[in-house]
Amino acid sequence: MDITFKDVSYTYQPGTPFQGIGLKHINLTIESGSYTALIGHTGSGKSTLLQHLNALLKPTEGVVQIGERQITPETNNKNLKVIRQKVGMVFQFPESQLFEATVQKDIAFGPQNFGVPEAEALERAKAMVELVGLPEAVLEQSPFDLSGGQMRRVAIAGVLAMQPEVLILDEPTAGLDPVGRREMMGLFEKLHREQGMTIVMVTHQMDDVANYADHVVVLENGGIAKSGTPREIFADPEWLTSKQLGLPTTTQFAQALIKKGFGFPKVPLTEHELAAMLRDQLPQGAGGANE
């Protein structure tokens, strides 16, 4: 299910003293099965764009096409339910939205709200708990008795239980330690790889952009400043710095090596890529005493 923005603009509180531009003339296609990262400094329009993906916001001008359905300024809110079932959104700190007495009931709430029979929704909850890496025993526990990382997994399981085709992630690893962040990103990569799920992620973690995304959109002042593959975007560190954006850790290290005289055939994005490129530049046998 492709998502297309056709000359989309959005104005906050139009006609009031608080009027502000959220998006301006966005033209963008997010292809089915892709993994897209939205990056930009605070206030660039990332979250505003994200909320158009499942019609939490409707465009002030232009058209958002989600699969076969169009969202325009005139679209009736009653027609948005199907879209919100197909496009699941994981907000920042989603664990704050947990409310049911047990984990199973909390996960089952979303599907039931969309008309899934209770018995089927409860079965989905069991399957989703396993999918997000939690033991079945947590189903009867209160979500508020779990650790912060477990609570976040429960909240994500609730979104996945609605069987969305597109998963929208707003800073999904915010507040997690490095191990928790790696596990969470591994879960999303598994969904993308094994189920072909389309993923759109807002993040400030450039390492995650380099390791997981296949397309990057850079937003600035409500518009698209640049888009391309991670390698294309991170190939110009000076431009990124001018936009108050950083580089992946590996790419930063490679830039330091370039200043020391090393050369690379392309921008290394991951540790494995950098190691392979450095290995090619070392004299044979220089990798260690065992070689």
From Swiss-Prot:
How does the protein's chain sit in the membrane according to the entry?
Answer: Peripheral membrane protein
Tell me the InterPro entries matching this sequence. AAA+_ATPase, ABC_transporter-like_ATP-bd, ABC_transporter-like_CS, ABC_transpr_CbiO/EcfA_su, ECF_ABC_transporter_ATP-bd, EcfA2, P-loop_NTPase
Which cell locations does it reside in? Answer: Cell membrane
Cellular component annotations (GO), alphabetically ordered? ATP-binding cassette (ABC) transporter complex
Enumerate the Gene3D superfamilies for this protein: P-loop containing nucleotide triphosphate hydrolases (3.40.50.300)
Family annotation (PROSITE patterns): ABC_TRANSPORTER_1, ABC_TRANSPORTER_2, CBIO
**Entry GO MF terms:** ATP binding; ATP hydrolysis activity; ATPase-coupled transmembrane transporter activity
**Top EC category:** translocase
The portions of this protein that span the membrane are none
Record's keyword annotation contains Cell wall biogenesis/degradation: no
EC number(s) stated in the UniProt entry for this protein: 7.-.-.-
Q: Name one Pfam family in it.
A: ABC_tran
Which positions are annotated as binding ATP? 40-47
**Taxonomy, superkingdom:** Bacteria
Q: Tell me which residues make up the ABC transporter domain.
A: 3-246
Q: Which keywords, in A-to-Z order, does the entry hold? A: ATP-binding, Cell membrane, Membrane, Nucleotide-binding, Translocase, Transport
Q: Spell out the subunit comment.
A: Forms a stable energy-coupling factor (ECF) transporter complex composed of 2 membrane-embedded substrate-binding proteins (S component), 2 ATP-binding proteins (A component) and 2 transmembrane proteins (T component).
What the protein does comes down to: ATP-binding (A) component of a common energy-coupling factor (ECF) ABC-transporter complex. Unlike classic ABC transporters this ECF transporter provides the energy necessary to transport a number of different substrates.
Q: Which family does it belong to?
A: Belongs to the ABC transporter superfamily. Energy-coupling factor EcfA family.
What protein is this chain from?
A: Energy-coupling factor transporter ATP-binding protein EcfA2
